[in-house]
Amino acid sequence: MSVRLRQIVEALGGTIEGGGGDVEILRIAPLESAEPGDLAFLSNPRYRQQLAASRAACVIVAPAMREEALARGACIVAEDPYAYFARATQLWKRLHGRTPAAGVHPSAVVDPDAFVDPSAHIGPLCVVERGARIGAGTVLTSRITVGEGCRIGERCLLHPGVVIGADGFGFAAEGGAWTKIEQLGAVRIGDDVEIGANTCIDRGALDDTVIEDGVKLDNLVQIGHNVHIGRHTAVAGCTGVSGSTRIGARCMIGGAAMILGHLEIADGVQVSPGTAITRSVLKPGLYSGMFPFDENAKWEKNAATLRQLHGLRARIMALEEQIRKDGPTAHIQ
């Protein structure tokens, strides 16, 4: 099914340049591999060479790239091409009827004491336990568990295998063994949240674990009990957040990051992939803590040197102290 450029611009705004609104779009494609009939986008001027070579029927560009885009053919001029592309994908999905229909799949299990909004979609093999609430327009794709008393807001999207409200990891050491701390809280998820496949969000021990509006969690993310994640924060795959940590709004957490428990992360913090956050971060900015990879032989030498840093530091401090006592010229031959 094709879509005319005019339909896209009428729905999303922007301006068509260098071509008529009757140009037919067959699909949305990457700039470098687009074919005639495709709609592509360019958000980074570094890739302008791909623009000149692209065979796309139309390219979404910023005003600064308008002239270069017109030199090759039709374009849609938008202030933020990447955001425009994102909204174009949503429009494409709506027009092609890929939005899940409201209702509960016959294989899903919904407790009689749970509430599911009539406009929500509960997919195959999902389980919604007692007292849980699923908001309007929310989609549970398949094999998802929403635990007792947990609440999910409106227009959320949960991908296969998500578990909401399993017990948090809480045990007390007693007599050489572990005594379980019953997890008496729940999970509260706001509106417009997306949760990737096989991500787990544990219920709180006493208070609830909270995921605020607009949060995006990638696949295989572990959120511990009593964590609080602020609005519009994005967390990439394989990240673990330990219990009772508070992450602010509009943060970006890179893949495979590790965040210890009982920490405070300010609004607007960015964490590089693979970074271990071991103390609170109280100022916005980009934080990194990775040991660079190298050829193994070089890495082993660097690692051996790293183990000696404390001793080397002590020796340097002793030398500096000796120079301070003797004067800066005493050791010059």
UniProtKB/Swiss-Prot annotation:
Subunit structure of this chain's protein: Homotrimer.
SUPFAM superfamilies given in the database record: Trimeric LpxA-like enzymes
Gene Ontology molecular function, alphabetical: N-acyltransferase activity
Entry keyword annotation includes Cytoplasm: no
Gene: lpxD
Biological process per Gene Ontology, one example term: lipid A biosynthetic process
Record-given protein name: UDP-3-O-acylglucosamine N-acyltransferase
UniProt cross-references to Pfam families, sorted A to Z: Hexapep (PF00132), Hexapep_2 (PF14602), LpxD (PF04613)
Enzyme Commission number(s) from the entry: 2.3.1.191
Active site, renumbered: 225 (proton acceptor)
UniProt record similarity statement: Belongs to the transferase hexapeptide repeat family. LpxD subfamily.
Known pathway: Bacterial outer membrane biogenesis; LPS lipid A biosynthesis
Function: Catalyzes the N-acylation of UDP-3-O-acylglucosamine using 3-hydroxyacyl-ACP as the acyl donor. Is involved in the biosynthesis of lipid A, a phosphorylated glycolipid that anchors the lipopolysaccharide to the outer membrane of the cell.
Coiled coil: none
Domain of life: Bacteria
PANTHER family per the UniProt record, alphabetical: UDP-3-O-ACYLGLUCOSAMINE N-ACYLTRANSFERASE (PTHR43378), UDP-3-O-ACYLGLUCOSAMINE N-ACYLTRANSFERASE 1, MITOCHONDRIAL-RELATED (PTHR43378:SF2)
